[in-house]
From Swiss-Prot:
Its main location: membrane. This is Delta(14)-sterol reductase. Keywords: Lipid biosynthesis, Lipid metabolism, Membrane, NADP, Oxidoreductase, Steroid biosynthesis, Steroid metabolism, Sterol biosynthesis, Sterol metabolism, Transmembrane, Transmembrane helix. Belongs to the ERG4/ERG24 family. It comes from Ascobolus immersus. It is found in: Membrane. It is a multi-pass membrane protein.
Length: 430
């Protein structure tokens, strides 16, 4: 059993998160009203305003929305199996094995959205599909919340299953602490699978959340057009930036197999709720706001937001590509000139290029891109800036987890490395 070095504040912290995240995810959307986002009276009477925008509990659920969410997941599973796929291997597990993964998230995206685009061209912007998503947004979100917690419970109970002699369930080092609340949040089993190929964590890591994010962005864009008769430059930029981000992730699906989500974290509420609810329903907050309150940026505004986006992406993708190229082949001409430090374990840590600037410089680029999404909404509401604040906190927390993991892995070599690469995320500041 793992030690009691709990994550996320231990049983109390994870328990609180599991209680408050679902209502937070709902209320940020409830507060976008026809009179403002939030309505003017919120600042003088927040509790009364929250009460007034709260729908009845029963109205948050519907059978058709639940069936729609189920159909969405079944479709993604079917496309994962049916479409051509790159077969990639994961990292070596503690039993010496390496799992194989079907990587075709990008192809799935192309097939899925090509179909939706074709239907929209044929049926026009009044096609029922788009209005269904926006009119039943809260019900779809509630169904996804229930699904994520139910799936979390199933994989948690399943992690205790007996195994044939000589085999064992491979558990997550951070989700195997012996406390049910904490382990339920973190995820006890590392790589739960159904059959040989259906890796439940891989399925959720990119597909339902990221594709759902773009799906709702487009739905709110159609809503803006049907309501106001135009599509604003701001919502076009939101769609371009966020679709770009998603496509980049889907295209690089095999590279996700070496990230902490896959190699270290178990599959629990944190990843399942995050990918089934938080990403698709919270990350579309900018498009949701702009559907009701269009913002016209003009040429100068567009240029400014584009500059922020391109700067962030150059750092984010440049750093990640450099790291992946070095890991794959240090002799590659693109990275062979980079300086590195060799640890006692034989690992090589980059100390020049992007990775000589900061130890997690890719997080800095990611956060800059988050600013570009929020800036498209102007400065008339704080709600749409929730994303950049939350994302900054997330990256700081992930940085601390990464640092602890690396210090445990490399020991004194990590201290030596930190003296060379002094900054953690933002050079000169942090």
């Amino acid at each position: 059993m793992g030690g009691k070095d709990y994550e996320f504040g231990g049983p109390i912290g994870t328990g609180v998160l599991m209680l408050i995240l679902p209502p937070i995810s709902h209320y940020l959307h409830f507060l976008i009203t026809p009179r403002g986002a939030p309505p003017p009276e919120f600042w003088s009477a927040p509790l009364e305003t929250l009460k007034s925008v709260t729908p009845t509990f029963s109205s948050l659920f519907s059978l058709h929305a639940t069936l729609a969410v189920a159909a969405y997941y079944l479709l993604l599973v079917a496309l994962m199996y049916v479409l051509p796929a790159e077969i990639a291997e994961g990292v070596v597990l503690k039993d010496g094995s390496r799992l194989k993964y079907r990587c075709n998230a990008f192809t799935t995206f192309l097939v899925f959205f090509t179909f939706l685009g074709t239907m929209t061209v044929l049926e026009g912007p009044t096609w029922w599909f788009w209005s269904y998503l926006t009119d039943n947004f809260a019900q779809l979100q509630s169904a996804s919340i229930v699904f994520s917690y139910a799936m979390s419970l199933w994989v948690y109970i399943r992690s205790y299953r007996p195994m044939p002699k000589g085999k064992e369930v491979i558990l997550s080092p951070v989700g195997f602490k012996g406390n049910h609340i904490h382990d339920f949040w973190m995820g006890r089993e590392l790589n739960p699978r159904i059959g040989e190929w259906l890796d439940i964590k891989q399925l959720h890591e990119l597909r339902p959340g990221l594709m759902g994010w773009i799906l709702f962005n487009l739905a709110w864009t159609v809503k803006q057009y049907n309501t106001h008769g135009f599509v604003s430059d701001s919502i076009v930029l939101v769609n371009l930036f966020e679709t770009w981000y998603v496509v980049d992730a889907l295209w690089n699906e095999s590279k996700v197999l070496t990230t902490m989500d896959i190699t270290t974290d178990g599959l629990g509420v944190m990843l399942l709720f995050g990918n089934a609810v938080w990403v698709p329903f919270m990350y579309c907050l900018q498009a949701r706001y702009l559907a009701s309150f269009p913002v016209h940026l003009g040429l100068l505004g567009i240029a400014g937001v584009l500059a922020v986006q391109f700067t962030g992406y150059a750092i984010f993708r440049g750093a990640n590509n450099q790291k992946n190229a070095f890991r794959t082949n240090p002799a590659d001409p693109a990275v062979s000139h980079l300086k590195f430090m060799t640890t006692k374990s034989g690992s090589k840590l980059l100390i020049s290029g992007w990775w000589g600037v900061a130890r997690h410089v890719n997080y800095f680029g990611d956060w800059i891109m988050a600013w570009s999404y929020c800036l498209t909404t102007g400065f008339n509401t704080p709600l749409t800036y929730f994303y950049v604040i939350y994302f900054g906190i997330l990256l700081l927390h992930r940085d601390r987890r990464d640092e602890a993991k690396c210090r445990e892995k490399y020991g004194k070599d990590w201290d030596r490395y930190c003296k060379v690469v002094k900054w953690r995320i933002i050079p000169g500041i942090y």
